[in-house]
Amino acid sequence: MHNEIEAQFLDINKDEIRKKLKEIGAGCVKSEVLMRRFVFDTGPHSFARVRDEGGGKIVMTYKNVSDEESILGTKEVNVVIDNYENGVLFMRGCGLEEKAEQESYRETWMFGEVEICIDTWPWIPTFIEIEGPSEEAVWDTAEKMGLKREKAKFGSVDSTYQYYYGVDEDIVNLHTPKIMFDMEPPEWARKRLH
């Protein structure tokens, strides 16, 4: 497994971020696409998933989040596969319990070796993830984009829901079987804190 060196910046304006990305010389490598995923329970602070990233790319991932306060707090391993349904069946066959079926929209940009993703999830404002080969690369890119290090968040999207709604991550992870755009939000997602 390797460290996922990534920082999130919440509540962004897509048009302003796209403009800033163009200004610094980043290029859009994948237009906004609907992604769908099944997430599986693998124990405390970790999960596995099968994600259809659009354009025929299917990825199975295992993540362990040991520290949601650190840019180096997440380790992951990814395997590209050729069939979404078979990936889900594989996880089930290994005895993993499904946590949730989820969807989001993602647009991907590159700035050198740094990947910038504009992510939109149900019931929360759009945010970006900046992922790079080193902490320095992530922070340099954020600075060029006018983003402040002290505003960065870390961890998985469940911690983003926790930030906006004050709900325990286990409620998002273990007790919300679907997070989809075409559904009414669950009770916990009806009153935002931020």
Residue ranges and their predicted role:
Residues M1-I116, K148-H194:
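N-terminal strand-loop-strand beta-hairpin
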Residues D119-T120:
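Short histidine-centered beta-strand/loop micro-motifs
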Residues E135, T141-E150:
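A hydrophobic, small-residue-rich beta->alpha segment in the mid-to-C-terminal subdomain
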